[in-house]
């Protein structure tokens, strides 16, 4: 039996930590200039990306962040 993946009606908060699979992403800022909600994310290993269409979803693994597509993905050393 498959479980439906459903979008949650909850905002992504700056400073919030959200999981996706085995990774965790920190929301560092909301981005302007996109048709869909976009946020800048930082993963624990230093990888950063801009996630467009980002939202929280109920999945088989629990609540996860997902997005439509990403831009500007890169590793950024901590300062």
Predicted regions and their residues:
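Intrinsically disordered, low-complexity regions enriched in serine, threonine, proline
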Residues: 3-5, 40, 58, 71
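Short, hydrophobic/aromatic-rich segments at coil-to-beta transitions
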Residues: 12-17, 36-37
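Short coil-to-beta-strand transition motifs
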Residues: 18-24
């Amino acid at each position: 039996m498959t479980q439906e993946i459903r979008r949650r009606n909850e905002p992504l908060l700056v400073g919030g930590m959200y999981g996706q699979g085995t990774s965790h992403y920190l929301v560092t800022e909301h981005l302007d200039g996109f048709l869909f909600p976009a946020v800048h994310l930082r993963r624990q290993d230093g990888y950063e990306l801009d996630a467009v269409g980002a939202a929280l979803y109920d999945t088989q693994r629990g609540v996860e962040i997902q997005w439509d597509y990403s831009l500007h993905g890169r590793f950024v050393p901590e300062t």
